């Protein structure tokens, strides 16, 4: 299971054709990486979040569900922002917004 597929992102962006698939895929990958970095998640933590697991050694079922929903919102927001502002994106503003969105799940220290 991927937390968000290209089809999910295209639906959120209201892109109907396959003409933008490559662009949406690149932006989605960038959005995922940016959100992982801002949330300060390790690759191992992301692997659990992006899987079908109901819980893990690190997260309860409720925590994992809440983290997944928060990450979905942040990733889709980021993908849409990058898609709509291809030419003139304000990455500082985007980063500050993502910090606010991801604050509740943000890890306390860098790994």
Language model region names:
Residues 1-111:
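Divalent metal-cofactor coordination and adjacent catalytic microenvironments
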């Amino acid at each position: 299971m991927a937390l968000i597929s290209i089809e999910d992102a295209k639906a959120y962006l209201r892109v109907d054709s396959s003409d933008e698939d490559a662009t949406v895929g690149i932006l989605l990958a960038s959005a995922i990486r940016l959100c992982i970095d801002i949330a300060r998640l390790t690759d191992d933590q992301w692997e659990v979040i992006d899987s079908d697991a109901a819980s893990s050694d690190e997260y309860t079922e409720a925590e994992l569900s809440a983290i997944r929903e928060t990450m979905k919102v942040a990733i889709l927001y980021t993908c849409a922002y990058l898609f709509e502002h291809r030419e003139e994106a304000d990455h500082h503003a985007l980063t500050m917004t993502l910090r606010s969105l991801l604050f509740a799940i943000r890890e306390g220290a860098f790994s």
